[in-house]
Amino acid sequence: MNELTPPPEALTDPNAVEFARIWAAHRQQHVSLRVEQWKHNPGVWGIMLSDLAHHVANAYEQEGVGTREEVLQAIVSVFLAEFAEPTDAPTGGMVD
């Protein structure tokens, strides 16, 4: 497997929790989520998605692939288009 290394802060915090994993396998996207942490406030996922977009934009800028603003604009544009007219219908269920 080709896993990412956890962030250093996660390794030093005994209360750290992983709440999402996204994999590409067999030419499809596969996701594992821990939703119980924000079970009564699903809107918090909107903050997480926004934070993730900003991290991606920072990474692209550091790699020299456009400015942070250009990358964020591209992410938001495609997100809104995909949200309005999905190109896929995620399936699956809860497992332990």
Model-flagged regions — what are they?
Residues M1-D96:
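Solvent-exposed interaction surfaces and binding hotspots enriched for charged
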